[in-house]
Amino acid sequence: SLGYEMAYSNVLNMLDLAGLPLRSADRPELTPLIVAGGTCAYNPEPLAPFVDLFVVGEGEEVTLEYIQLYRQAREECWSKEEFLQEAAQIPGIYVPAFYEPVYREDGTLEEMRIREGSGAPEKVRKRVVENMDGAYFPVKTIIPSTEIVHDRVMLELFRGCIRGCRFCQAGYVYRPVRSRSPELLAQYGKAACEDSGYQEMTLSSLSSTDYPCLLELCDDLLDYCAPRDIGLSLPS
């Protein structure tokens, strides 16, 4: 998951520590498959030589689609090339091996040429989860054996942001704004605390105080959290 550009070198370090060839072209087998997503996947070319496919946009739905395709590829003994050709047909999937960037003398991009015979689409459109209430939420999570930074239940109130700050990458790529209902969020938060044993719950979004039902949700969650000594917080 590529959250910011300074993490690119970490990706290469991870591949090196795993004993894997860095470049996708030097990994001819279907397994392992290197997949990248996150906000930086909207500008995939810096890591294009090293990643097999990028997920452009939101991953809840498209991840299930390419995993199902990957299972089929394993069962039917597809080659890596065959799998990537089929994966490229899934909306939101960008396979860099099927495209060749052409640059001008000043280093700016002139065009993207599609590799002949690849069947890759001319444009890759980002995936957007239309209905946040219907999107998957990880009520049951894997609890780490060591202390981690975000050692709490994270409730995503809504996706996107109404502010449009010019410096904020996430505020633009996660448009349009889509909210979860307060009833469902309260249900998720309580269930996640019961399952994990976490003693803190965070109401997380790009601008959480813009959530229209914030007071209603906080009242509901405080009635649950206070008797159980569970903290309820907003991100900074």
Each language-model region and where it sits:
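Flexible loop/turn segments at secondary-structure boundaries
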Residues: 5-8, 41-44, 62-64, 101-103, ...
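Structured alpha-helical segments in the cores of large, soluble enzyme domains
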Residues: 34-37, 41-44, 63, 153-161, ...
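Canonical Radical SAM [4Fe-4S] cluster-binding loop centered on the CxxxCxxC motif
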Residues: 147-183
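N-terminal [4Fe-4S]-dependent radical SAM core
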Residues: 96, 107-154
